Amino acid sequence: MAARSRSAKRARGVGTGVAIACVLACGGVQAELLSAYFPPGVPGYGEAPGVTVLSRARPEYENPGTRLGSFIVQPRIEEGLAYDSNVFGSANPRGSWIVGTHPSLLVNSDWSRNSVGGYFSLDDWRYLDQPQQSRTNWSAAVGGTLAVGRDQLSLAVAHLLLHQDRTELDALPSDTPVAYQVDDVRASYTIALDRLSITPSLNFTTYHYSSTTILGAAAPQSYRDRNVLQAATTARYELAPQRNLVVVIRALDSHYTEPQLGQPTRDSTGYQALVGIADDADAMWRYHVLVGWELRDFAASQYQSHQAPIAEAALIWSPSGLTTVTTTLTRSIEDAAQEGIAGYTYTRARLTVDHEYLRNVLLQASTGLQHADFLQGGGQDTAFLFGVSATWLINRHMRLAATYDFTDQRGSSNPTLQTTGNYTRSIGLLTLRFGL
């Protein structure tokens, strides 16, 4: 497990400054994908992708952390200065300078067999020209794994206080960011049977939203409060070393705890089935591809059942030791923020190119698409994304990152859909990170 711990630290190494830019620039349902908020190394949450140019080991530029017994402690702080050209995502843009502060603490065991990891982070953004848009997010998680013979038990718990910005897909045109709280508990048990492994898992997540205002009028958000229970089974069969056939079966139950008076409940049950291959055997081509189908049944007769093809895919191409090209695709059915709309089909595609210009100068360019197709005739939202970044690894403790992100979002003209609408937005960010 020591090797796993060290690789987790390496995977976290470069991307933090870029991730902070994404907090400002990226919209959509990412806010509810919990793994996006925790680094690799937190059992149950952090998911390390295949090694890319940005995530590969660079011992001379990695901050080693501080050893406390059998634990490695990594405190970090980042300071950023940004400019957002369209804070409100409107046709008449208003910009603002932003000062960001991001302290974090990652703690990992360095045991040979089992593992424990914890993470705490805070994101504070001060909008100098639009102070009412300032917000502070924080998140904390702890998880662990326990080896039981050849099997493995994984347990994790997390608490997050976040804000939904009005520029996100499916977001309401609120006067200020909508605060919401997420609590999550998850457990899984991997049964190893020679070349076959079976992992049953159980996740329970609660969402609680604070009230906001729209054009100065009170807009309670408690109708979005919900409890989500997910049970899943994942089977992996080893076709060859580092090449696996994967089958995933999931059942989901969403229960809204504060339904609107006079409105049908948005409670639902969902069923997902995916099949695919995870192949990490080739140094040049690595891919994880799952495709399948999802059915969503709603408790209220006013909402028709909905079904759609779904996918979870990632392809990494390494044409040379200095460049990697990563393509990702996700498609799923999500719960909606809009009143009277039970959900939407969400599609996200992204292409990212990472290049090592020098050993300590790393470049990245990406383009992407996000699309939300709302149920009950609620219209559509589409966002086109483009971004570039450069990271200078100064030494083992300091690095400087510059990022630029552009968003072009096109919303439906359907009057029942309360979203921001059409807008373009540019964000430039300069971040200095210091870590021990």
Residues of each region from the PLM?
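Cleavable N-terminal export/targeting peptides
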Residues: 1-48
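Gram-negative and organellar
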Residues: 31-436
